[in-house]
């Protein structure tokens, strides 16, 4: 850690002296001009009620379009954090009709510092309900992750096409916020970086934008489906992209960009910015009656808890905040050496569309059922959980992916933060 920190410090100081951010400053000026354009929205605040012991304070944050004189966004912020005796930060809320509920838990774990941040926001924009959930896992310091918590979703809602073209808005906001962060740090010798895994729900349509190795999964009809793909340097497509830009992938305990950073995309990391971009990969889906829950988490969870286990654990608790706490405790008990932060979002769907089955009709059909097919789920409940995500081992075994030359060293580096 001392060696890598020294290398980063040396590189950052050299980069600051030669003025590598001239282009970034020019882009930032353009961003400021873009974000200063006003748009008037008719808005109302979504009401929430608390579902845990934490008291919730809601405040409306108004952003005013001075050219039109209308209120643009009325935003309900998350309440102040509350820490219990064990050092856990957590709580939860649900909307008025109970169709959506959310719980979160954040824990420093075995690390001496906390570099994980999260953000949860909800609002109504032009009559459209919007909810945003984000996990930001910092490396090399906490400044980048904290900056994303403070600015990413606010910047997103200011984008003129947030509602009409949400994918475009997410893509541009991620890249613009990255440039803005680098500009804000231009006079420092720090080289902080961060992941960002964000789930944005616009009405019933979900968008997941990911940069880095935090992850978002959804449970649909009992299946654990990954909605993001970890950005690792030895991912074949990422390796080709980095090498095409003139970068190198080196082994230093794990595969790293330039021998320094153990992820291929991130916010910040100015001296690797040519290779380590903040352009998100975005997936979207409709939240229908099969969608049961979302889990967003930092790699402190995913290092030791597979997608299928995460869904099973989250489903085992009725309240999402209890599910988030259970996931965090499980990761810690399984040996996670990292900060652990997760958000669980649960959906409740009305079942009115299901036909009512008469008792005598069920009795007549029972002899035709195969009893073995009914007993299978009870004999092994875990078989009901399937996954459509790509296993990490499968990714690394692709023909053009970089093989692990020292697999025996992996247990020693598990939980190690990227770039340290």
Curated annotation (Swiss-Prot):
Its EC number is 3.1.3.16. Residues 403-420 have a biased composition (Basic and acidic residues). It comes from Arabidopsis thaliana. GO terms for cellular component: cytosol; plastid. The keyword Hydrolase applies. Keywords: Hydrolase, Magnesium, Manganese, Metal-binding, Protein phosphatase. The keyword tRNA processing does not apply. Residues 101-347 form the PPM-type phosphatase domain. Pfam families: PP2C. This is Probable protein phosphatase 2C 76. It comes from the Eukaryota. InterPro entries: PP2C, PP2C_BS, PPM-type-like_dom_sf, PPM-type_phosphatase-like_dom. Mn(2+) 1 binds at residues 137-138. GO terms for molecular function: metal ion binding; protein serine/threonine phosphatase activity. Binds 2 magnesium or manganese ions per subunit. It catalyses: O-phospho-L-seryl-[protein] + H2O = L-seryl-[protein] + phosphate; O-phospho-L-threonyl-[protein] + H2O = L-threonyl-[protein] + phosphate. Belongs to the PP2C family. Residues 353-420 are annotated as: Disordered.
């Amino acid at each position: 850690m001392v060696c890598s920190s020294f290398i980063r410090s040396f590189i950052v100081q050299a980069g600051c002296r030669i003025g590598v951010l001239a282009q970034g400053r020019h882009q930032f000026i353009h961003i400021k001009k873009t974000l200063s354009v006003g748009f008037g929205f008719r808005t109302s605040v979504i009401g929430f009620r608390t579902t845990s012991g934490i008291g919730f304070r809601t405040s409306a944050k108004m952003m005013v379009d001075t050219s039109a004189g209308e209120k643009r966004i009325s935003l309900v912020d998350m309440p102040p954090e509350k820490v219990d005796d064990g050092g856990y930060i957590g709580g939860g809320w649900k909307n008025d009709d109970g169709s959506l509920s959310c719980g979160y838990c954040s824990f420093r774990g075995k690390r001496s510092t906390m570099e994980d941040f999260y953000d949860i926001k909800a609002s109504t924009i032009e009559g459209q309900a919007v909810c945003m959930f984000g996990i930001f896992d910092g490396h090399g310091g906490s400044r980048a992750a904290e900056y994303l918590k403070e600015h990413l979703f606010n910047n997103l809602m200011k984008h003129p096409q947030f509602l009409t073209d949400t994918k475009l808005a997410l893509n541009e906001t991620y890249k613009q916020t990255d440039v803005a962060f680098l500009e804000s740090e231009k006079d420092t010798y720090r080289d902080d970086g961060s992941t960002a895994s964000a789930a944005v729900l616009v009405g019933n349509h979900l968008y997941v934008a990911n940069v880095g190795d935090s992850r978002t999964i959804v449970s649909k009809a009992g299946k654990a489906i990954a909605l993001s793909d970890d950005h690792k340097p030895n991912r074949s497509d990422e390796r080709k992209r980095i090498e095409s830009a003139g970068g190198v992938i080196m082994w230093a305990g794990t595969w790293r960009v330039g021998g320094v950073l153990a992820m291929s995309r991130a916010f910040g990391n100015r001296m690797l910015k040519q290779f380590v971009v903040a352009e998100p990969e975005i997936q979207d889906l409709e939240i229908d009656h099969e969608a049961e829950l979302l889990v967003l988490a930092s790699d402190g969870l995913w290092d030791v808890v597979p997608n299928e286990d995460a869904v099973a654990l989250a489903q085992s608790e009725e309240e999402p905040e209890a599910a988030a706490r259970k996931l965090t405790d499980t990761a810690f008990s399984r040996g996670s050496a990292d900060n652990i932060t997760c958000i669980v979002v649960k959906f409740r769907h009305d079942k009115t569309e299901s036909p009512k089955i008469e008792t005598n009709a069920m009795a007549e059909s029972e002899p035709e059922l195969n009893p073995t097919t009914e007993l299978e789920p009870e004999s092994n409940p875990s078989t009901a959980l399937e996954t459509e995500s790509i296993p990490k081992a499968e990714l690394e075994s692709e023909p053009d992916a970089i093989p692990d030359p020292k697999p025996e060293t992996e247990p020693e580096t598990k939980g190690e933060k990227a770039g340290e």
